[in-house]
Regions:
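Local sequence-structure signature of Cys/Sec-based thiol-disulfide redox active-site neighborhoods
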Residues: 15-50
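A short acidic, amphipathic alpha-helical/loop segment
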Residues: 43, 70-71
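Residues at alpha-helix caps and immediate loop-helix transition turns in enzyme cores, especially N-
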Residues: 39-41, 67, 98
Length: 115
């Protein structure tokens, strides 16, 4: 199944909770409105497309700030955008933000969720 068919757009705290309950091992991408978002999403797409076992939740932080803040509060991580967060068994196990979202970081995150 291609990545585009495994993406859920999350707009509320309840949707975030539902996504993570249904997909305890998954990835969240918090998308901002600056030029970094599309540039970093290239790495996300390239590394998640072949991983048919992983679903991707996307939070557009400008439109859905409560959902983004919920993730930060729930998992004790600072809100950033763009930001990639890997979950394994319902726990945040790896995250990167801004220009630290690279191919190397994606490989590292995938290694952590696959261990």
């Amino acid at each position: 199944m291609p990545l585009k068919d495994r993406i859920s757009f999350l707009t509320s705290p309840a949707e975030v909770d539902g996504f993570l309950q249904a997909n305890p091992t998954a990835v969240l991408f918090k998308a901002g409105s600056c030029h970094k978002t599309p540039e970093t999403f290239v790495h996300v797409q390239a590394h998640l497309d072949p991983r048919e076992d992983l679903k991707l939740g996307i939070i557009k932080v400008v439109e859905s700030r409560p959902a983004s803040n919920h993730v930060a509060e729930l998992f004790g991580i600072e809100h950033e955008s763009p930001q990639i967060i890997f979950f394994k068994d319902g726990k945040n196990v790896f995250d990167r933000d801004n220009w630290d979202i690279t191919s190397d970081a994606m490989r590292e995150g995938l290694k952590v969720v696959s261990a």
